Amino acid sequence: MSMEEKQNFQISQDFSASTIKPNSEEAIAEAIKYCYKKNIPLEINGLSSKKNIGKNFQSQKTLDLSNYSGVIKYEPEELYIKVKSGTSIKEIKEELDKKNQQFAFEPTDFGFLFSGMSNEGTIGGVLSCNFAGPRRFKVG
């Protein structure tokens, strides 16, 4: 993208806070555009369950997706569920349990390692880190 195109992004929200908590796709896109336009390093978080894995990231702003969660559509008979990226693994499992269904993979829970308690994180974190777990080889 050229500098001219970058400067032509239209930003309609105030992003002065260090943590941005959008609750819609439009607000997420706006935040990313804003940081891109201003060359601001942006960290994306859900429940921070994988924050201690890998190299530390120095960011000026955090895009917190914990407000962007929930089941959009669930069709148990089709084995289909559509959720927002900030939806917790726990919430999805609870929804699947109602129809005696389960994941065909096993997301790794690093919570016990870092905090001593369960924190499986969000579906966005699982997919973006490719932490589908060991069961995916057999059933995923």
Q: At which residue positions do the language-model features occur?
A:
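Short amphipathic beta-strand starts and helix->beta connectors
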Residues: 2-7, 64-68
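Generic N-terminal amphipathic, Lys/Arg-enriched alpha-helix
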Residues: 3-19
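A gly/ser-rich beta-alpha-beta helix-loop segment of oxidoreductase catalytic cores
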Residues: 103-140
